């Protein structure tokens, strides 16, 4: 029996979740061993959506990762009439299917960048992939930013040389706080409504975006795992985290999509940092 595109995409997002959680737990173990501490582990919580589907939220609060969440979800049903006009292909009957993975990491150390990543596959009367990854350092380092971008550029160039400059630009434009006239972090890539007419190619690209993240971000975290930091640096991190909150509540499409489709509120707002200061 032929496996549907929906199932192919959903299975990959589950596999990627397992790979990411395993790698992040390994980092916690490496740190805990040197400090004589018990390493943190992910706690998984399942949820069901009224109307169809559900997901699993994986959350870890450790000594390295102050809060890291990896969500997978597969939901289906009908958009509300007022939301249909905003989604391509949903105008007529409002029916949709959406599966994806979403990851947000907030680190205890203010020297280690926060990171956001997601990839998804959506079907209405049309179908497409979307997603990307972006880095939010509080103390940016050029070599670190370059390494993060290089990983995604390599994934993009494998498929289309126009992808990286286009998706980088879309990331810069998307992760921008208009009310403050400043970017959120140092960017990465962001793509949406990707349908080249070749599902296998678009799916393979989306897989490689996930693998790129898996190759580069743990390396960045490990490079600063044991660097000392000051209370002043931590204070600055907490204040800058406020920008993260502002963006996610005011502009984030995933937050809006989740709330409009009656998703799990805890999973949707998992992206918010555990501690933040507004001065």
UniProtKB/Swiss-Prot annotation:
Amino acids binding substrate: 102, 118-120
Binding-site positions, a divalent metal cation: 106, 116, 149, 179
Class of this enzyme: oxidoreductase
Site residues (Important for dimerization), renumbered to this chain: 179
Chain residue ranges for the region called Important for dimerization: 244-279
A molecular-function term among this protein's GO annotations: protein homodimerization activity
Superkingdom per UniProt: Bacteria
Organism lineage: Bacteria, Pseudomonadati, Pseudomonadota, Alphaproteobacteria, Rickettsiales
Protein name, per record: Oxygen-dependent coproporphyrinogen-III oxidase
């Amino acid at each position: 029996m032929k496996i549907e595109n929906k199932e192919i995409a959903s299975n990959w997002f589950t596999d990627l979740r397992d790979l990411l959680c395993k790698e992040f737990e390994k980092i916690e173990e490496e740190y805990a061993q040197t400090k004589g501490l018990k390493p943190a582990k992910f706690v998984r919580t399942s949820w069901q959506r009224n109307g169809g589907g559900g997901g699993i939220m994986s959350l870890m609060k450790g000594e390295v990762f102050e809060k890291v969440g990896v969500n997978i979800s597969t939901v289906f049903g009908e958009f509300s009439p007022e939301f249909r006009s905003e989604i391509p292909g949903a105008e007529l009957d409002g029916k949709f299917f959406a599966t994806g993975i979403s990851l947000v990491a907030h680190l205890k150390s203010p020297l280690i960048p926060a990171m956001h990543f997601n990839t998804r596959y959506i079907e209405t009367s049309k179908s497409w992939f979307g997603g990307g990854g972006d880095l939010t350092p509080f103390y940016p380092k050029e070599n670190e930013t370059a390494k993060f971008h290089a990983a995604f550029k390599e994934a993009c160039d494998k498929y289309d040389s126009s992808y990286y400059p286009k998706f980088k630009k879309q990331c810069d434009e998307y992760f921008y706080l208009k009310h403050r006239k400043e970017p959120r972090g140092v960017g990465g890539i962001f793509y949406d409504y990707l349908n080249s007419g070749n599902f296998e190619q678009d799916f393979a690209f989306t897989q490689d975006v996930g693998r790129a993240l898996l190759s580069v971000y743990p390396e960045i975290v490990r490079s600063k795992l044991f660097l000392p930091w000051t209370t002043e640096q931590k204070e600055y991190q907490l204040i800058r985290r406020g920008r993260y909150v502002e963006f996610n509540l005011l502009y984030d499409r995933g937050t809006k999509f989740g709330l409009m489709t009656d998703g799990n509120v805890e999973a949707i707002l998992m992206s918010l940092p555990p501690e933040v200061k507004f001065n």
